[in-house]
Amino acid sequence: MSPDDIATCVGCGLCLPHCPTFRVTGEEALSPRGRIAIMKGVTEGLLELDADSVSFLDTCIQCRACEPACPSGVPYGRMIEGAKSDLANDGRVSPRWLRVGLRLLRHHRLLLWSRPFLALAQRLRLVPRRLGLPLLSWRNEEPLRGTTTEPDVWILTGCVMDAWQRRTHRSVAELAERVGLRHGVPSREGSCCGALHTHAGMHEESIELAERTMRSMPGEAPIIVDSAGCGAAMKEYGRLIGTAEARAFSERVVDAVEWLAGLMDSADTAALLAPTRPEKPTVVIQDPCHHRHVQKVHGATRRVLRDRATVIELTDDGLCCGAGGAYSTLHPRLAEDVRDRKVSAIDAAIDAARAGRHDIMVASANPGCSMFLAAAGLPMRHPVDIVRDTILPTDAEGNRP
């Protein structure tokens, strides 16, 4: 926690309406201003870091909605990451079970081998619904494989997305092939980007995984990432590691919808991505926080959907859904309170469109958000999957050949 960073906050409070935990509790200590005051008090020796103070800091979802709202440019994301790292090093946050679980993510085969056991646990109702895991089949889908060792683009496969949402990777690959691009996938070393570890305050592990990810996709080809949280983390490797190599790698990272929007705006590829079906799905856009507040590519979601879907906008100014990486497992009650506001906003938008949940789909470009909202009964889809299915064939039930 840098005193210089802390000093940038002037206490104006313009961040408060944008903070999900403040919105649902009304507690000053559960706002960015309140949490910065705790950081300031602790660093100046005026405040004891007791259990309450730790809890106030730990219950930040790290959505970073406060950053674009702040006229002083307070680097809140960097500050709360530093605070979480200090607390994690002291054993005050991120319990052992979470650390062990996150360390398993680097062992990708183990994650995939666990699928049948997790599928069985789901059917025995041993997996809490609030985790939002999709109902898993007994067998893993075929992994995405690269088409060349010298790709035009890389597609990050990662850990959670590759375990449970491989369909979206396939959508990215099929769209790349449609415009004539050869794709590569990371070597086994790049099985996890470290985003969840950063959220949990596991700073050293975050750096190690970032360096492994960088080694797994060498060269200068763009890196397409279809998980908003992963893309945000990888675009900040330059800040995390602080080397010219890391900054150059971050410059290569592009979110999948950002990449698609560029292709649709290019005269060379736009026609290849034109919709081939007359019917338009009705889509509610739910912006993941790391799309909207960190990467600032939420406009690209609208660009890729506007010509092929009837888009319904929410009126909640991009309020967080409450998922926050592993947040919903650590603070389920607060996460569900935040989610309830998001679900209410989505239902209100659906009602205003004179539709029902069965008539629409909710587009979200982050696996944590989509799984957490799916657990509340919402029909979730990745924007890239929606785009793919308006161009390439599916059967009457939406299955792909």
Q: Where are these predicted regions, by residue range?
A:
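Alpha-helix capping and helix-loop boundary segments enriched in small/acidic/polar residues
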Residues: 7, 26-30, 197-204
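Iron-sulfur cluster-binding electron-transfer modules in prokaryotic oxidoreductases
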Residues: 76-401
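Secondary-structure capping and boundary motifs in well-ordered enzyme cores
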Residues: 8-11, 49-55, 59-62, 168, ...
